[in-house]
Amino acid sequence: VMYGVIDFYREAKKQGINPILGCEVYVAPNSRFDREITGGDDRYYHLVLLAENEEGYANLTKIVSKGFVEGYYYKPRVDKELLRKYHKGIIALSACLAGEVARFLTKGLYEEAKKTALEYQEIFGEGNFFLELQDHGIPEQQNVNQQLLRMHQETGIDLVATNDIHYT
């Protein structure tokens, strides 16, 4: 959700900070309109979206709003159709272990993960999708990071180091 983003933006600017506005969204495995429960952890995937400019902020608000209005099923969900429609001005990160790319990697499905990463790069454009490295000392995460490094070398998709933090 993006509640409070305007107050946050104004206060950051007042303090001389250039804020980066964004949101972690839930991506439905198929359509945001689906109301069927899929098994296990694959009910939705995490994806980080950051507004690159004013157009990106406008598109981000549309994506998030439509996730609530059209895709709400236990959680507000978006889908790749929506991301394709409103991708301009948005930078996307592959997210944590709950992201689609990482989920495939933890299941040993490297080629499917790579295909998914390339699909996100196609949606957001080269230079606007990043593979997200995190290290919280979790063995599974360290394994995923090694595979993301390999994927970077094979695809040229850039890496970004982050931490799984949430601002409320």
Regions from the language model: what does each represent?
Residues 1-168:
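Phosphodiester-processing cores and adjacent nucleic acid-binding clamps
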